[in-house]
Every structure is written in C-alpha cells, then in structure tokens.
Amino acid sequence: TRDISPYGKEWCTKTVSALASAQEKPLIVSGLALGTDICAHKTALESGLPTIGVMATGPETVYPFRHRDFAERLWRTPGCALISDYPPGTAPLALHFLRRNRIIAGICDTTVLIESKIKGGGMMTSRLAFSYSRDVYALPGRIDDIRSQGCNRLIREKVAEPLTSVEDLLDSLGLNSRVTARKICTRDI
C-alpha cells in the first residue's frame, strides 16, 4: 500500500532486516512506490541487501518524483538496480503500474505482501505470483483496517500463507540457521 500504517511499516522493516541476517542474502524487489515499496527498498539498503526497483515509466523518469534521489542512490549501489520494461519518454500511466507488477511477480521466488486494500496493486502482484507457482505470504491485520483487508482475503482464499513471525518466514525460505536441509532457489538477473 502507498498509505502504510505504523503496523505495516514496523513489520516491513522487521521482515527485511531479518532477511538481512540470513547467511544467503536474498534480493529485495519492489516498485519504488510510496509506502511499503520505499520502506522495503530503504531497509534493504540500510541492511546491506541488494534491491531492485521495478519502474512503471521510462528509465529516465522516477515516479513518484520525490523518490528521485533515493532511486539514484539505489542505482549507484553495487548489487542493486533499476529496471524498466518501457522505453525512454514513457509517462507514469495507471496501466503501466499493473504491467510492472507482472515483472515483480516474475522476478521473485517469494512475494511478501505487508498491507493492501482489496483492490491494491499488491493484490495483483500476489495473485500473479501465486499463478506462477511462487510462494506468497501476507501479513494478517485488523479486520476493520482497510489496509489489511487485501492481506486477510489472500490468507482466507489460501493464495497466501500468513506471515506470523519473521522466524517462520526465514525457516520457510530455508534462510534460518536452524534449517539445514532445504533447497534454495535463486535467480540471476
């Protein structure tokens, strides 16, 4: 969600920070948007994790504009990248954000949805990831919080596993030191 709650921000930060403690460093992929996306990217950089920002514009246009300095920092950081499926001069149109989500879902072995409204872009990304036979996790939230309704629905529909602790996520991904025998899939980009 672009309108991340304090609960969502706390769990996004905890989750990405915990991933940084793993022996095998995962790649954090998100869309450079307000809220959860930028929280994940910033926490990844602060924690020494590689991160990729998938753009819904041409490569020279950072949207939202206020993330331009951060995008430049990300781009200059070894192991990090900005990628776009669009040619230079492409404006930030609504349809482009939906198409960007298919790239995010395709790059990632696992999708973690921190918060989403029922019709949020994260819902589309999560459903695409599920349709690609990827693992999907969603942070359960209060039933009366619009920002948690999407996550709660994905859990109810069994599209996503509930993210109930960072330790469980690390175990599930085979990144926890307590897990000794688990194949970890990685992608080279």
Language-model features: locations:
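Glycine-biased, small-residue-rich flexible motifs in mid-sequence functional cores and linkers
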Residues: 1-189
